Each structure stands twice: as C-alpha cells, then as structure tokens.
C-alpha cells in the first residue's frame, strides 16, 4: 500500500525531510466543533458515538473538512480497552467515565485476562477500516491507546480522580497486584494497537495522561517499563510501510531522555517544557511532537499565530523531526476560528523558515 498523498506527518515522525512542519491536534474531533455536537446529539450518548463505526468515521473527518490538518486520528476513547476487559464502562451525565466493577479485590485482579480486540473491540477495527476508506489516501490515520498505568488509574479508582489514592495505596501496599493489572493491560494494548494497524492505522500513539503523577522511581517501574514493552511488541511495518509510534506522558519532561530510549519514533511533549531544550536533550534519537499550551487558543488570532511561531522557532532550524501539536487535548470551549489561525501560522511560518 502506498503512502498517503500528504505524507508530511509520517515523514516528520521518521525524521525524513519535509517542506513544512505538519500539524494535528489532540482531540481535534471534539466538542469545540458545532458539527461534532450535532453528530453526538444524533448518537444519543458518547458511548453510542464511539461504538458506531459510521458515526466515529463521520466525526473523525469533521476537523479535516474544516482545517488543513496533516493527519486524522481515530475517534474513540482510551477506556474501550478496560471496558472490553469486563469492567463495565458507563458515562454518568456531567460526571465523566465510570466503571461498574473497579478492580479492588485480589480475586478480580487475578481473573483479568488479555482481551481479544477482534472479539470485544471489533467496532473500533470497523471504524478504522471505514475511516481509511473515507480518507481515500489523503492524509495518514493515527490509531491510539491509553498507557497501561493511565488505564489502570481508571480501572482501580473506578472513575477520574484528583488524588488517585486507591491506585497509589495499591502501588505501595500490594505492588504485585498492580503489576498484574499492568501486565495484562499491556498485553491487551499490544493486541489492540496491532489490530488497529492491521485494520489500517498508519501510525499509533500511546497516551500516558497520568504517568506524570508518579514519583520518579514509580514512573519507571509502573509506567515506563510497560510502555517499553508495548513499543517492543508493536508491528513496525504494514504492506511495506513503516508504522511510527508516538509516546506522550503528560508532565513527563523529567523523564524525557528515558522515554526517548524505549524505542518509540517520537515523544509527545506537554507545554511545560521548552521544545528547544527538549530537542537538545534527546538529540536526533526521536522526533518531537508538540507543544503549544492549549489555552493559547483562547487568545486573539494574532496572538495564537505569534505563540505558534515561538514554538517553531524554539525547535530551531530543521526540515524534519517536528510534528506540531498542542501540549494536551484541545478544550471544548476553544473558538473554532483560533484553530484556523493556528494551522495557517504553523504551515506558513515553517515553510518560510525552510527557505
């Protein structure tokens, strides 16, 4: 299978020359877009939207119809994996995701098994295939999963948390139980991402949203080593084309060199680290993705453009190795016109800097 017509994103991840800096946004298909809100309304609820391949395809494509983005990302949710493992995902109105059966008991943890992505997550694979057909080889499609530790946070807490006291208590009191959860989840994520690749994903990303809440030693033991295992288990090629991998730990700047050493092709950065400093620290080992503060998009368009240029200038002179993104997901309250200003600024300024 040939590369997409616009393969700038893939080339940047593989540190091949590009004519400009490619750009996509975490949560680019989301509630800041009125068309997304309309589709979600038709779906009835968020889970219905995720589990309908046709609707997931529709919302995946919406930001690409509006903006000149360089990649599409599968519309789904990181919690589909623990849901497939039998924890009973549901969304309480106004309260976010919850699990009916959080993992607190030893017997339940010992009964966990690796999920078969085709048996339990077939709707995701159907969505990937449908999106690839709809994209018609225009831009690459990114598949994704949460990291084992981030998924375990929800699996043990049963919902989002401000202090993660249940999983932290397990980490210190019964690290063996947490390692059991992480091991089964890591193997499930490997199978899940490889199934996405087989279904058409052309790059994959691991979102480690909560790894940055760990202590230095705990991060390496309970988050990083499992992401290393996943990266090692990923399919590196499909139909003769390299499948790059991106790893993103929010608040992970402390461990940048260690993340770059696990075998991934690119490291995602949040907005708390200077991307130029990050580049100096990792050298040419990996590409970098990021890292504009998402809240910049609440500023005036000319400020958005100026802040985007600061990120590009900080990365420094190069014709490859940088994928522009936000430092975290785009806010649902973002004015859509701010994204227009951002895309135009990134593409135009990066083209000029290569002349």
Swiss-Prot record:
It comes from the Bacteria. GO terms for molecular function: uroporphyrinogen decarboxylase activity. InterPro entries: UROD/MetE-like_sf, Uroporphyrinogen_deCO2ase_HemE, Uroporphyrinogen_deCOase. Its EC number is 4.1.1.37. It catalyses: uroporphyrinogen III + 4 H(+) = coproporphyrinogen III + 4 CO2. Disulfide bonds: none annotated. Its main location: cytoplasm. CDD domains: URO-D (cd00717). It is found in: Cytoplasm. GO terms for cellular component: cytosol. Keywords: Cytoplasm, Decarboxylase, Lyase, Porphyrin biosynthesis. The record marks 77 as: Transition state stabilizer. Substrate binds at residues 27-31, 77, 154, 209, 328. One of its GO terms (biological process) is protoporphyrinogen IX biosynthetic process from glutamate. Homodimer. Catalyzes the decarboxylation of four acetate groups of uroporphyrinogen-III to yield coproporphyrinogen-III. This is Uroporphyrinogen decarboxylase. It comes from Dechloromonas aromatica (strain RCB). The gene is hemE.
